[in-house]
Amino acid sequence: MVLSIRSQIIIGVVSSILLTSTILAIAYILMWFNGHMTLTLTLTTIITSCLTLLICSIFINPLIQKIKQFNIKTKQFANGNYASNDKTFNSPKEIYELNQSFNKMASEITQQMNQIKSEQQEKTELIQNLAHDLKTPLASIISYSEGLRDGIITKDHEIKESYDILIKQANRLSTLFDDMTHIITLNTGKTYPPELIQLDQLLVSILQPYEQRIKHENRTLEVNFCSEIDAFYQYRTPLERILTNLLDNALKFSNVGSRIDINISENKDQDTIDIAISDEGIGIIPELQERIFERTFRVENSRNTKTGGSGLGLYIANELAQQNNAKISVSSDIDVGTTMTVTLHKLDITS
């Protein structure tokens, strides 16, 4: 049987009183007091001890009540009621400090739970959006494939157009799966080794796959180095992905025949390199510029399949930048264009 604190204290006090009274009674007898005096002293001792017990109970009772309140609060917390956070918990110092520590723990757990719920909601919306985005290219691929198989599409120009659409939708699927792969790996703590980067060579390797598209869309793309930049150490893999996503974004949200500029500058005092990708696209209104890197946000403020992709490119780029010693900033004017600037901090591999 587990005794309550009240019972243990009372038993302790009563035992102490009985022991003290017994010892005093024996002492009175040994002192050769007469019977009347011995009885008087013994009764006085017992009465005094009872008063002590009463006073002790008066002081102990509020403490017991506070402990009961604290026990109720911990049970509520254990049952998922994280809002039961009594800030006006008056009690002795030790119990007060215990309550403050509990409140702090409850507050932190509540914040973590809210964050988990928010992230779970975002993930649910993300999966729903991606599932919807996957249906469109899949339906298109199935439709045109069946048309080619069943002989419905027979004219040469229609066949060529169908193949072009199939390739386009297959590329779109590839982009969607690529985005999903990066979303999954973003929060796994994966690290990349620093590599020596020659920036002009890196840009050539990034821009080469876009050569045919730029020619086909009659675009102008210029790369400008403000000064000669020596090779430096950075995380190559995430940097390639960041620049690719920003370039994709510039191409998606600007018109065919428009201009794309990539300007590179170096700040030797801060040991940083800025890579600015500018387009002549639709632009972003100021109140939305802070939100464009959110996981569930798209510039059009709707899931417009016209631009293709999942709308996750900027989110992925920003997350990779934050995780790999870089930063992305944005400046934009409506119907003028947008500039995305990646600020790279050179890595000191000797430290």
Swiss-Prot record:
Location of the protein in the cell: Cell membrane
Residue(s) carrying Phosphohistidine: H132
Entry membrane topology: Multi-pass membrane protein
Protein name: Histidine protein kinase SaeS
EC number per UniProt: 2.7.13.3
Post-translational modification (record): Autophosphorylated.
Residues annotated as domain Histidine kinase: 129-348
Swiss-Prot/TrEMBL catalytic activity: ATP + protein L-histidine = ADP + protein N-phospho-L-histidine
An MF annotation (GO) of this entry: phosphorelay sensor kinase activity
BP-aspect Gene Ontology terms: cellular response to phosphate starvation
Chain's gene name: saeS
Gene Ontology cellular component terms for the protein in this record: plasma membrane
Record keywords: ATP-binding, Cell membrane, Kinase, Membrane, Nucleotide-binding, Phosphoprotein, Transferase, Transmembrane, Transmembrane helix, Two-component regulatory system, Virulence
Presence of the UniProt keyword Transmembrane helix in the record: yes
Keyword hit for Membrane: yes
Residue intervals passing through the bilayer: 9-29, 40-60
Protein origin, superkingdom: Bacteria
Annotated InterPro entries: 2-comp_sensor_kinase, HAMP_dom, HATPase_C_sf, His_kinase_dom, HisK_dim/P_dom, HisK_dim/P_sf, Sig_transdc_His_kin-like_C
Domain HAMP positions: 61-114
Pfam families, sorted: HAMP, HATPase_c, HisKA
Purpose: Member of the two-component regulatory system SaeR/SaeS involved in the regulation of staphylococcal virulence factors in a strain-dependent fashion. Probably functions as a membrane-associated protein kinase that upon sensing the appropriate signal, autophosphorylates and in turn activates the cytosolic response regulator SaeR.
Signal peptide: none
